[in-house]
Amino acid sequence: MATIAILNEKPSQARNIAKNFGASGFRTTRNGDNIIIVHAVGHLYQYDTSDITKMVPADKYDKYKSWDLKNLPWHASDFDWDKLVPRSDVKDVLKNLKTVFSQCDEICIMTDVDPTGEGQVLGWEPIDKLGFSHKKITRAYFSDETDKEQTLKAFDNRVKLKPMKQDPEWKMGAFRQRWDFVSMQFSRITRNLGDKKTNLPQGRLKSAIIRIIGDRLAEIKAYKKIPSYQVKFKDSNGNIFTKGDAEQYPKADDVPIKDFKTGNVQLVGTQTKKTTPPALLTLSFLSSALESKGYKTDEVLKTYQMLYQSGFCTYPRTEDKFVTPDQFDQMLPLIDKIANLVGVNPKELTHRKPRKTHVKEGGVHGANRPGKNVPNNLQELSQFGPSAIDIYVLLARNYLATLAEDYEYEQQKANLKEYPEYTSSISVPKKLGWKSIYTDVSIDEESEEYKSFGRTADPYVYEGFPPKPAQPTMKWLMTQLDKGSKANTGVKKEAIVKRTEEILKLLNEHGHKVETSGIGTGATQASIYSDLTKAKKVKGKIVTHPMIKSVKGKLQLTSQGQMSYELLPDTYIGSLELTELVYAEMTAIKAGLLNMDKCLDEIEFFVKQDLQTMMINSEKMRKNLNIEVNDLVDQKEKEVLEFEGKEWNVSREWGGERFTDQQWADLKAGKTIEVTRISAKTKNPYTVLGKLSKQSFKGDKGTVEYVGFENLGFAPKKECPNSWGGHVFTDDEKAKLNVGETIYVEKLKSAKTGNFYNANLKLEDDGNGGKKIVPSFG
């Protein structure tokens, strides 16, 4: 009898697995083995992005500590990638895992299965860092944690893993993790080449989003509404007859309209056409559809996650856009109940056989769809958040549409007997099919209204304009991201395209293919979009401003976003082809066809090129946006001073301001000085006493010593306060008190009794170098 630990990704997953295993207190038995179910809370270990010097040799500390651009690019080989640090908020979780792992003969990773290998990395981290890699490590693959039969089967069929650094999925996920870490260099570049004080975060997806929106806004700004004129015909029902290559005229008066007369309409053909139901929704398109109802993307993501954890929806971060035959069969018994719940007549769901377009072998979790737990009523879902009901209804109707018949319409074509080159067509609905259930939220559909052809059509002068680019919306953005490099309207980075083609050819020769497409998964797209629309705060202070804002559903760049956009032209990090390269490299690394370290080294080339390109872009950007930069703005002035027989770098600033020359001289002489600063919270001035002293703080590397200004507390008040005893002093009263005179004040209020009294007031010494108000009576 062996003891096996099942490691889940998060508490909710552990609860579901425990329920499926019939565990009591997260302990049970199966097939004669003892089972202990434990969990992480996402990634328990991470790279310390706040101090990357922990990961490099001591002789390279200064290079990686400094934000000076001369220290770029980084060398991926300089980093000790094993130096992951535990999150500060997971000590108890790690303690529990260490206790349980020490009791076990085997550890089974049962985290989420995703196409990037993240679940594998997340599972290996605590096993490796806590020192249990020597034990038998297995992996259970499943797609739905709420499915008892499936999870038990996955556990019974678990696969023994190779050592961590030989595990193909770990290598794939670790490469992506390290690539994104090293890409922080681009953010250092944009801060330095921006206004030197604003963080402008960059990354494969972040930069692509800014680039796509910025390009569209630039197209709109450059658009010129230049009219042209031509002859068209219109029948009595408003149908327009157009000639494909009609001559265009710059002025309306130039159009020879008198040469045309009324034409007779004749039907020249009819054709019955069908459209199949739209694709199943990704999380990004679901979020964009709900944004139009006023729901923030962040709220939708959180609510969907809770719906999933309760079994009402399937795995949100899926990359799949279809379901498997087994998943299709599992849904069939639930269809009528779901339909009645969301207001769909089950009799309309007559296509209950798998569609080749929506049901395929392969994939992992299957596309987003309702879960196996069907609520008794929609109000039951409101406990999960304001968007919960709308999420479920949209998701359900989207899936139910695949069980309805095709939309069928008759396309009628007509022309004019006298001018046969002038044609028109209309679509006449015959069977609504799936359109009676669901409106495709992934496209902007045109009106379904139509009118039959009239008998005749009259000529008229048509004023036309070049089509104006549509305003960017979240739905539009997600469509562009799904297109990947095909969304690129500019010049492609040929070096990336060529390298990607080489890797794809290599994969094809060995029978592999890239499972991911577009720029990011649907869940990642929605998550990064949400990040870019809100400020990031640390200890109440904004460290990163929003880059995008949505105004009545239309996307705009903030001033920070515009700054970032104008730094991106012709860069590799802003290339829409970059993610496709990374996906190809991930797949090849997993397949053992490429070396992870060599792929990471390629980033040096991108950084070198982008640094030069952004320097050129920076000059244009600062000129366009009227940004003046002080090269010293982001540097604290320091001076090397000898203190207690040792040299120290000592800051000449405190409280956001520089010490005056006299204050600095007094501090260096060992004197205690008074310093007045403005409170960041109250905006009022305050005065403190302080001196230079050796101090210390506890950091991740242990106790760190430094010499700096020591705040000794507030300085004694030497002038009259603004008020006392409920009485607000006038300027004249304060002037008299400050020169030692006595004033008489009526209706002073006792703080102890609340009673009013009259008294003589005088400003006297308080015995501590300051002044205080002293009352006297009589």
Show which residues each predicted segment covers.
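Active-site phosphate-binding and catalytic loops of NTP-dependent enzymes
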Residues: 25-28, 135, 163-168, 189-192, ...
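NTP-handling and nucleic-acid-processing catalytic cores
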Residues: 13-18, 195-228, 232, 390-391, ...
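Basic, low-complexity terminal or inter-domain segments flanking catalytic cores
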Residues: 2-5, 24-26, 127, 137, ...
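Intrinsically disordered, low-complexity regulatory segments
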Residues: 1-185, 446, 454-456, 465-468, ...
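Metal- or metallocofactor-binding catalytic centers and their adjacent structured scaffolds
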Residues: 164-165, 249-279
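C-terminal or mid-to-C-terminal helical accessory/interaction module adjacent to the motor/catalytic core
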Residues: 95, 103, 150-233, 270-274
